[in-house]
């Protein structure tokens, strides 16, 4: 069971610049120890990227009237599809450094329930 589940609802992978940024960020997550990655949504190219990078893909995220994924739905899907002790919602353009997991472990030692914001 991974310690942390990272979950995100990326933008479509249609713009080459955005696609490169998101691919680099998501790849950085997959290189971390003790981490599971879940990508949420039906955006163009998302299923293919998830398969290529070997991460979970859950297309059925609820959205508001403007088509924006609902945070509540994202958390619900992550909780239902993960056995991790920690959940981390993250923007798909954020590269994580190798010390991320160790820092999360240290925070978990300080408090049973916590929220970290960057």
Describe the role of every protein-language-model region.
Residues 12-15, 93-97:
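Short acidic, S/G/P-rich loop/turn micro-motifs used as interaction or catalytic elements
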Residues 1-28:
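N-proximal low-complexity "stem/linker" segments adjacent to membrane-targeting elements
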Residues 3-4, 27-38, 55:
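Short loop->beta transition adjacent to catalytic acidic/histidine clusters or analogous donor-positioning motifs
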Residues 39-87, 97-98:
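Active-site-proximal specificity loops/subdomain of glycosyltransferases
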Residues 90:
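Catalytic metal- and UDP-sugar-binding loop of GT-A-like glycosyltransferases, i.e.
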Residues 19-26, 73, 99-103:
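Well-ordered, non-membrane alpha-helical segments in soluble/globular domains
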Residues 35-42, 115-117:
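Short, hydrophobic beta-strand segments that form beta-sheet elements in well-ordered domains
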Residues 96-118:
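Conserved donor-nucleotide/metal-binding helix-loop-beta segment in metal-dependent transferases, i.e.
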């Amino acid at each position: 069971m991974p310690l942390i589940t990272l979950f995100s609802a990326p933008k479509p992978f249609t713009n080459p610049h955005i696609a490169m940024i998101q691919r680099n960020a998501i790849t950085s997550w997959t290189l971390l120890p003790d981490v599971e990655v879940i990508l949420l949504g039906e955006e163009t190219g998302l299923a293919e990227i998830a398969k290529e990078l070997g991460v979970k893909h859950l297309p059925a995220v609820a959205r508001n009237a403007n088509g924006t994924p609902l945070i509540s739905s994202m958390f619900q899907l992550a909780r239902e599809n993960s056995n991790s002790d920690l959940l981390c919602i993250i923007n798909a353009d954020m590269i994580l450094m190798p010390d991320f997991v160790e820092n999360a472990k240290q925070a978990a030692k300080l408090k049973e329930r916590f929220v970290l914001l960057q």
